[in-house]
């Protein structure tokens, strides 16, 4: 069953392949819109990936040093 765009909104994904260099949150944490959750290094640039809205972190699927593919789910959020 497809949950459509709702599923995408409740996850933070890697925009490109890269290496996770910082994890700035943990499950159960309350985060605000635009708060950085994970920092990804790709093509020698550090890219902070931010929460799309105020939320509670449901799960963190990566650790510092992990290599991830583009589109990989890094963090799951609950509104």
PLM features per residue range, with description:
Residues 3-79:
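Structured functional modules or segments
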